[in-house]
């Protein structure tokens, strides 16, 4: 079974794409490029089309077979796509963590558990797991145009960005997928007051954590998201 466009879109929503080779951590031997493709050399550059094509190849050659081996033909397309996204992010948890045989109820109970990194719960992982669960639970016969990742509702929230000393430095607004710098007090008032009926929650994160969760670089001085 192959991942659908909905599955690819879900993965792209939570994975950053970089068209120049980089090392996420300095001790890795090879470089990473595109949508997290590992194994290229320093100085490699790709086009967006190359990155998109390689993502599909990587998923269907490596991660989709993991899910196929687990579900044994019992999953529908949305269930399959959600589990592929989980595998792409967390690896072959079905084998590594000894998952019980596939059933909808069992998998729905397991997906939200993968929200920790470094011994801490990360809100970015919480949001990704919820997006996967929403898709997993969505009937394949649905013709709704609602957003698959949010059940049709864009869930906005504000983020207080802290510098390395823990001091509030900048404000951001996010829908759980992308992040935007709140540049002026007027913009902040718009989010807090004029949109008060949305009852936006407020999260507090170090700016380095924001960069890690959304795969973006932030200028510490200006707060701009690059």
From Swiss-Prot:
List of catalytic residues: 15 (proton donor/acceptor)
Any single Gene Ontology cellular-component annotation: host cell cytoplasm
Pfam families hit by this protein: Phage_lysozyme (PF00959)
Protein purpose: Endolysin with lysozyme activity that degrades host peptidoglycans and participates with the holin and spanin proteins in the sequential events which lead to the programmed host cell lysis releasing the mature viral particles. Once the holin has permeabilized the host cell membrane, the endolysin can reach the periplasm and break down the peptidoglycan layer.
Superkingdom, natural source: Viruses
GO MF terms held by the record: lysozyme activity
Family to which the UniProt record says this protein belongs: Belongs to the glycosyl hydrolase 24 family.
Organism (species): Lactococcus phage c2
The keyword Hydrolase is assigned to this record: yes
Catalytic activity reported: Hydrolysis of (1->4)-beta-linkages between N-acetylmuramic acid and N-acetyl-D-glucosamine residues in a peptidoglycan and between N-acetyl-D-glucosamine residues in chitodextrins
Other notes: The bacteriophage lysin is a powerful lytic agent with a narrow target specifically for dairy lactic streptococci.
Cysteine-cysteine disulfides: none
Alphabetical GO biological process terms: cell wall macromolecule catabolic process; defense response to bacterium; peptidoglycan catabolic process; viral release from host cell by cytolysis
Keywords: Antimicrobial, Bacteriolytic enzyme, Cytolysis, Glycosidase, Host cell lysis by virus, Host cytoplasm, Hydrolase, Viral release from host cell
Primary subcellular site in the record, as a coarse category: host cell
Record EC number: 3.2.1.17
Keyword hit for Hydrolase: yes
InterPro entries assigned to the protein according to its UniProt record, in alphabetical order: Bacteriophage_GH24 (IPR051018), Endolysin_autolysin (IPR033907), Endolysin_T4_type (IPR034690), Glyco_hydro_24 (IPR002196), Lysozyme-like_dom_sf (IPR023346), Lysozyme_dom_sf (IPR023347)
Name listed for the protein in its UniProt record: Endolysin
Cell location: Host cytoplasm
